[in-house]
């Protein structure tokens, strides 16, 4: 019905008092089963939809959501997530939504545990988590479940943890897409390089692991003859060490022209290629990080895949708001668009598009 339905109208249809309707709508006690059924029948017949926004405003309760994410230094992907989250907070200020950001040191389990302990001690209404390793994150989410605190996962999907919702790319599809795009320019090659950044011999991001599965699956099915040579640039190394490793690699692989990384650090290789004047080699990577964009425009990076980080940050806060404040159902899995950036279109990328 287009007309506004009043409590008085519902009471007349159900043949009960206005007070009875009010108690049913707000799930209060002291209503007989017969009266409740009459009211519920009237609500269904009149297609009544409660004004959840008005109810939330009238409730006049403040809510605090925590965003637990890696500490970073001017890294565009994480900055955009923060900006999106804080924009959502700003737009919901009438509902007294407060978002607090807590930073943990990347790839540092004790740091993650310390921060999630502080988060739990603060008794938040909801939490947004950029996951660490699976079992470490599980320790946190198990405690959230124990305290009935809803949480949303951002960036990496771990469905076994039973989150309220997830926002990020479909990592397998993203990796497969990356392989398909790379082969548009490298299908005649005999060998390509896959650059990784590892710690203690393993990739620390579940998202990157899943991207690699998708990448290799596509390559195996469509270009099995192309050799994939891995190059590790250890996370704990400094830039000068990377340059030494890269110089040795490209000197010993003079016929290799195309590389890819499934993380946001394509600029490490891209910058090296520029300052060593290797104009016949390119790398493909992820994320519209400032240094990546510079290399993309100068030609050492061939393509970038964007993840709509701003949208992720905004949507995570909005999902907690809708689930906790408005008591609405939310989508459990929300995959971000897989967007391809070239030097010709990178300046038109709308990072804040919602």
Describe every region a protein language model picked out:
Residues 1-60:
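N-terminal helix-turn-helix DNA-binding module of bacterial transcription factors
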Residues 42, 46, 202-203, 219, ...:
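Hinge/cleft segment of the Venus flytrap/periplasmic-binding protein
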Residues 51-110:
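Amphipathic helical "hinge" segments at domain boundaries
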Residues 70-79, 100-111, 168-174, 196-214, ...:
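Hinge/beta->alpha junction and helix N-cap segments in small-molecule ligand-binding domains
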Residues 91-95, 147, 219-227, 274-280:
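Short helix-capping segments at alpha-helix termini
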Residues 127-145, 229-291:
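Hydrophobic alpha-helical
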Residues 136-173, 289-297:
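Flexible loop/hinge segments that line or gate small-molecule binding clefts
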Residues 166-193, 242, 308-325:
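Hydrophobic alpha-helical segments within soluble ligand-binding/sensing domains
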